[in-house]
Amino acid sequence: MSEAIWVKLVGTLPSLLWVVFATVVYLSLRGTIVQSLVPRISALRALGVEVEMAGQLIDQAAEVSETAVTPADRQGVLGRLEHAADILSGGKILWVDDHPENNVALIRLFRSVDMRVDTVLSTSEARLALGHGSYDIILSDIERHGDPQAGISMLRELERMVIALPVLVHAANFNPELGIDRRIFAATNKPVEIVHYVIDLMERARFGSPQV
């Protein structure tokens, strides 16, 4: 073999060694790299929808409720949804509202993370649902069928039934200056805040903390 060929081989040896070294390192660390990506991949798959679709549902819910969603609000709630996907999966919500069409976007959003959402139109229907199934959270409006205190009356009914589930109020005409009933975990007219509160309550339920 000529001297020129030997010189050329010697010159390419460092590059070949780096390729071999990189290959060995990749094969050695491949399992660790994949495992580090699993939580994020699982969270994205558990969402059931693309993150952008979840963002669109948030925007639709805000539009129906006539509340503004800032870019920071949007980014924050989508980030929580992604990381709380496993906690939300399997959660059960009973939603009491005589206008469920106003909640379609949020219902779709919660169902997209594998939550069960049952909708009823009245307190009497809520009693039947609670008697035949178990739930983690009750979501309710305040005014129903012309009764401005229907939601509050339902709370007293829950007490008589000895049902201690946390109650979230989502009402377009909610006025925090009027105060919040002791049985209400939180109340708001902002869909983004409802999502945060649902995550908060499901975290408590999963980790065994007191709910109310």
Regions found by a protein language model. Name each.
Residues 138-160:
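Conserved phosphotransfer microenvironments
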Residues 1-63:
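Membrane-aqueous junction of the first/signal-anchor transmembrane helix
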Residues 104-112:
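Charged docking surfaces used in two-component/phosphorelay signaling
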Residues 90-100, 106:
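Conserved acidic segment of CheY-like receiver
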Residues 168-172:
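Hydrophobic/aromatic residues positioned on beta-strands within the core alpha/beta folds
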Residues 63-92, 191-212:
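Non-catalytic signal-transmission and effector/linker regions of two-component phosphorelay proteins
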Residues 131-133, 157-164:
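Conserved phosphotransfer cores of two-component systems
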Residues 119-137, 145:
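Acidic, metal-coordinating helix/loop segments flanking the phosphotransfer/catalytic sites
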